[in-house]
């Protein structure tokens, strides 16, 4: 349908925070005037947009629960309607699911569908003792037509044995719409089971050793994976790590590859320098809470960040 595009778009928002006892209620409503936006099929349409976000939480000694709901409808706000993916974004709408940090638990991560989605997430944290914490999270994301986009069940337990040793472990279940998130027509829903564990050992006041391991089981995409990491830290300046991601369950025996990485980091007041060898598989890479699809890569990588 033809239309005359608007060269100006107007946005506004309303938010409130209500606290009473252990209860906390946050709501936010943002709206955008009509402008040209791309739909899921890459066709421009003249549409207004809105986002409704609700967060209800309750906490008391040793227990907390949080319920979140997010409704997004055509709130794609960019410098140009022809920009796609992470290009030209003016605002940021967080995904309606848990932000995972382990390599395999974050391999299939959902990106907010700005054209339209409904997301529901609930999380509980229980501390039966000072040294033990149990966390359970569930999230469900679907489209306007109730098509399943993403679903996750996550449970983790963490225990501090003494001043030196801390152990955590858990299990994740994910159902992921790869056709939608990675633009792969005809791809089936990816269904995974991922157990994981992490051990931190403080050698002394300055030195520590951290070990991660996880395993992903799936019959879709590239099959099963194993992941391992060893990290040695000398506070507050140095960090060294080696890791391997092994695609041992690939249906093609010739592609059951190892993806090695070795990194070193130097921290200085206001400065952080990292460098190392990276071999990564194509897929979603999450860094600092931002997830994006990256190509396969094999080579040296350096980064420098500075605060002024």
Outline where the language-model segments fall.
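Exposed, low-structure sequence patches enriched in small/polar residues
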Residues: 3-308
């Amino acid at each position: 349908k033809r239309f005359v595009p608007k060269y100006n778009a107007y946005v506004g928002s309303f938010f409130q925070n209500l606290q009473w006892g252990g209860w906390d209620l946050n709501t936010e409503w943002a709206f955008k005037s009509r402008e040209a936006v791309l739909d899921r099929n890459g066709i421009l349409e003249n549409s207004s947009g809105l986002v409704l976000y609700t967060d209800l939480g309750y906490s008391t000694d040793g227990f907390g629960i949080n319920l979140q709901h997010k409704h997004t409808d055509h709130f794609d706000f960019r410098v140009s309607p022809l920009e796609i993916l992470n290009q030209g974004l003016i605002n940021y709408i967080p995904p309606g699911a848990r932000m995972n940090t382990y390599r395999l638990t974050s391999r299939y991560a959902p990106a907010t569908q700005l054209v339209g989605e409904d997301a529901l997430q609930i999380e509980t944290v229980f501390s039966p003792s000072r040294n033990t914490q149990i966390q359970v999270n569930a999230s469900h994301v679907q489209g306007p037509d109730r098509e399943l986009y993403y679903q996750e069940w996550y449970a983790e337990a963490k225990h501090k044995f003494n001043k030196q040793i801390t152990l955590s472990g858990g299990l994740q279940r994910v159902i992921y719409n790869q056709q939608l998130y990675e633009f792969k027509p005809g791809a089936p829903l990816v269904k995974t089971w991922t157990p994981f564990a992490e051990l931190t050992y403080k050698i002394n006041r300055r030195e520590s050793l951290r070990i991660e391991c996880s395993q992903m089981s799936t019959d879709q995409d590239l099959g099963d994976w194993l992941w391992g990491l060893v990290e040695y830290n000398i506070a507050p300046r140095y960090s060294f790590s080696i890791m391997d991601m092994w695609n041992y369950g690939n249906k093609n025996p010739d592609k059951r590859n190892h993806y090695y990485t070795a990194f070193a980091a130097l921290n200085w007041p206001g400065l952080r320098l990292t460098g190392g060898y990276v071999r990564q598989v194509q897929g979603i890479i999450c860094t600092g809470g931002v997830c994006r699809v990256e190509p396969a890569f094999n080579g040296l990588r350096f980064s420098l960040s500075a605060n002024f």
